[in-house]
Structures are given as C-alpha cells and as structure tokens.
C-alpha cells in the first residue's frame, strides 16, 4: 500500500480544524508584540473572563448543591429529621436498660467458669468446717505407692515430698496412704508371726529412716486418718 494513502488520511483529519483559523492572519517570522490576532482575540477574551469565575468562591459553581437540587440551604441542617432522635435517646436507652442492657447473673457466670476450672488437691479448703471425703487414687498413683511401700514402709520427709511432687499429691495424702497401707499390711500378716510382721517382702528399712518417719507421724497424730483404701 502506497504512502500516499496515509498522507491523505492524515490530511483529512486536520482539514476540519482548519476552519477554526479562517480569520487568522498569515504567519510570519516577525510580527508586532502588541498586535492582536483577529482569530484569537475573541477566544482570549472569553477565556480571560471565564477563568476568574472558576476560582471565585462566590461563583455559582461553588454553591451548595442542596440549595438548588434539594431545597436545603446552609441553615437547613439544624432542621434535619435527625434532630428529633436526640429527644428520643433517653427513652430508647431506658428501654434497652430494662432488656438487653441488664447485667447477667453473676452466679451463672461464676458457675460456668468453675465448670471449666480444674481444682487441684492443694487448692481445696482445709478448714475445720470442711467435710472430708475419701481420697481416690489413679491406677498409676496406686502402683507407684505400692512399689514404694514394697521397699520402704516408712518414708522420710524428703522422700515424701519427692513422691508428692511426682504423683501430683500432697504430703498429707502420701502420709495417710502409707498409714492405711501399714495397717492393712499388719492385718494381713497378723497370724504369720512376728518375723513376717517385721517387714514386707524386700529390704528392711533402716533405723534412721524408721525413726524419722515415726517422729513425723507423731507430730501429725492429731490428724484424722481416712478409711482404708480397698
């Protein structure tokens, strides 16, 4: 395709705009600085007259659209329907206070919290008015206590603390379990003679350990022993 097609196409685009400059004087390299062209004179004056209006605050373009479109002036905002809600707010809040704004029962909240709260043995009350219940031991705790009792019928204070921490029990629970276990063992070996009743199967406890355990038991004689565990 020849290049003349593009030239004719471009020329046809600018021919329509050439009519805008029909009144313009022929251009030249030298023209008077103060001369006013007839083709641009009217347009320049119109542009100069419209530009101040665009940036004039008092221009109709800057007027509030509510004044013409919605019939609301600058002072009409105080008469909006929202003002009527201010008078009804106390009534609405009073109605909400009777219903959803009421505080829930504190007992119900504490009951739900206590249901999901795990109580450990050391957290229970130990006052004189507390009703003592029978302590239940897990199979793991019972097995470990039986293993310890097999080697030592009496525990020292240090060993009792170690077992209490290992089995998540209190020292008093360990002490009572060993007391009940010794009573049960004595009943089982009552008719077997003094030799069998001296010590269980295994090593005989040392004299120091026995004396320390007996002293600890004497200090806690005022505590009530629980029922023998089956």
Curated annotation (Swiss-Prot):
Which portions of the chain have biased composition (kind: Low complexity)?
194-213
> Where is the stretch described as Disordered?
187-230
Extent of Acidic residues compositional bias: 216-230
Q: Which SMART domains match?
A: HOX
Q: Name one GO cellular component term.
A: chromatin
Pfam families referenced in this protein's UniProt entry, alphabetically: Homeodomain
- Per the record, DNA-binding region residues lie at 130-189
Q: Which GO terms describe its molecular function?
A: DNA-binding transcription activator activity, RNA polymerase II-specific; DNA-binding transcription factor activity, RNA polymerase II-specific; DNA-binding transcription factor binding; RNA polymerase II cis-regulatory region sequence-specific DNA binding; sequence-specific DNA binding; sequence-specific double-stranded DNA binding
Query: One biological-process term from Gene Ontology?
Result: stem cell differentiation
Keywords of the record? Developmental protein, DNA-binding, Homeobox, Nucleus, Transcription, Transcription regulation
Segments carrying motif Antp-type hexapeptide: 119-124
Q: What is its main location?
A: nucleus
Q: Where in the cell is it found?
A: Nucleus
Write down the InterPro entries for this protein, in alphabetical order: Antp_homeobox, HD, HD_metazoa, Homeobox_antennapedia, Homeobox_Antennapedia_CS, Homeobox_CS, Homeodomain-like_sf
The record describes the protein's role as: Sequence-specific transcription factor which is part of a developmental regulatory system that provides cells with specific positional identities on the anterior-posterior axis.
Protein family: Belongs to the Antp homeobox family.
Query: What name does the UniProt record give this protein?
Result: Homeobox protein Hox-A7
